[in-house]
Each structure stands twice: as C-alpha cells, then as structure tokens.
Amino acid sequence: MRQKAAAECGVTLPAAFRFVDLSLENPTDPGYFQEKAFWDANPRAGELDSYPTLGSLQDVKHPVGDADELVKSGDWAIQGHADYLPERLAAVHASLTNTSGPPTIFYAHCNAGCDRTGEFFGAYAMSYLGYNVTTAMGEACKQCGRCPNYYATNSIGWWCLTLEAQGRTDVGPCMDFASCKPLGDCTAHNATPLEDDCPRLGLGV
C-alpha cells in the first residue's frame, strides 16, 4: 500500500496509522464472508467497517411519490434511511478529522469499485469537500473508468437533493447531471472532474 501510494500519487503514508477497510458490499457479494473472516483472524492488521449499500430504485427525475417527502424520509433508498449516508458519512468524517491519535486511512470499496463506491465517495465529497454534483459524478466516472450505475447515480442525485433541502445552494443540477438506462448504465452530463488525478484536498468542515 505504501509503494502504491507513492508510485501512483507521490504520497508518503505516515509511519503509524489506523487502517480501516470500509466495505460497502452486501452478503450476496462474492468474497463478503471471506473478507470478514480475514479481519476476524487478523485484528492487529486493521479493522473492518461494514456499510452494506444498496442505492436507489427511485429515478430522481421521475420518482414514484412526492420528491420532497422522499427526501425528508430518506425512503428514496432501497433500504430506506437515505441509504444510511448521514450517519456513515459523519462517522468517516469524524475519524478523518480526529487528531487525538494516529491518522486514519480508509480503504473504501464495493465489488467493482464504481457503483456503491461512487455513491459513497460522491456523497462524502458533496457533503464535506465542497464538490457540486457534476464534479462528484465526474470524479466517480473518471476514477473508475465508467460512470456509476442506475442505483448509485440516482442515490447521488437524491443525496444532492437532500443537501439542497438542508440549505445548500451550491450543489448544482441535482436532477440533470446524468442520464441512465432503466436499471442499467449511466452517462454524465457536463461532468466537471478535477484536473488532478490525485486530488489533495482539505477534509472540509
């Protein structure tokens, strides 16, 4: 990991750090139970935070039901509770900004590294790094090599609307940043990814 960070982005990891494997996978994913077994057997190597993520079946452009009520309740997500993004994003942010111990390094992933990962990182970046939705989507597409799928892209849109409902005025076009085939692939509209492939940004507030 140290060699990869240095080779790909010129980043030198600290001598001591807390390593967290942040898994967005579900029990139906290949390798889910093997990953859990590894961390159970190797607790000194790091820790596993399991954040099962399902995304949204609700098309953010054409929802079934009242969009404002879906945002308020979080029922736009398959598992409700806004896909548990509020508490999960806050927990990650608290760990990243905690200066009372060694720094925390999160290795967040799903199965492909594009869809649920794109949803989670996109939501975090909009919440804490000041990204608007076209930058969040642009980075998700660029870093993976393809755009997040229907479930994840709609989640990004719903999270954008959630932030807008909380008073954010800088999140961009929450309902017009992408187009998706029904339950399939998505294409970004006017994506604005960062120029740096290895962005070095503050942690936000």
Residue ranges of model-derived segments:
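Cys-dependent protein tyrosine phosphatase-like superfamily
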Residues: 1-112, 119-205
